[in-house]
């Protein structure tokens, strides 16, 4: 871990997206095993979360872009 990191459990960076009744949180975090993104969907207090290791960021983003491009052509 690095000296200038926020306290444990605090995200290194965070984004919040609100769409209708849903709120999405994207938190970049770090622990002893490395950096990861915690993606949380909150719908009326019910939360679902996935953890994405930083080694998968680029592949995830590329797959996401392909889906967005495909959907735009429908």
Predicted regions and their residues:
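Positively charged, low-complexity terminal tracts
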Residues: 1-74
């Amino acid at each position: 871990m690095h000296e200038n990191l926020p306290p444990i459990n605090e995200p290194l960076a965070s984004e919040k997206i609100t769409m209708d009744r849903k709120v999405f949180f994207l938190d970049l975090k770090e622990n002893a095993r490395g950096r990861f993104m915690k993606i949380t969907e909150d719908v009326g207090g019910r939360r679902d979360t996935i953890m994405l290791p930083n080694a998968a960021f680029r592949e995830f983003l590329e797959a996401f872009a392909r889906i967005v491009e495909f959907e735009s052509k429908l």
